[in-house]
């Protein structure tokens, strides 16, 4: 896709959001199946746009707003996502690799059968999100916030840095596999219903200065506490 074509689509989508032209419903941006690699989509309002199976490799989406968007099967490779805002978006079967999500916001989003690999996710917010069979491998997730999120089915945190994170009111952290991670300064000050359940093979895990209250560790083998 050329930059000129992209700008025309974005201009039409702005009319869709403003509802200021006749037949505005047909102006909605649908990028399904397109190659947006290397494109600049930063500082844009792309609410209600569709991005199924889109390639965002090397694209710039910094400080853009995506609400009620479909990212099914989307590919994010070396993508700039700093301070992006995702609200009620579907990331089923999507993949994030070597991408920057520093200070990004994800609220009420669905992450199913997808993966984050070698990403920078420091200070990222995942609030009221649903995770189902998600792999998080070799990521930097320091100072991230996972408040009020739900984990379904096995989710794996592998070889990642998880320092000083917030896990307030997480509902049922079930079937999580944590391997070769450093977990430091977890704070869970609320939620008497939070459950850390069935953590598998916690090799080389270090829990340092953790403040976890009202948690139940069921069928777990937690090692190397300091």
Predicted regions and their residues:
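Tandem repeat scaffolds
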Residues: 4-8, 18-226
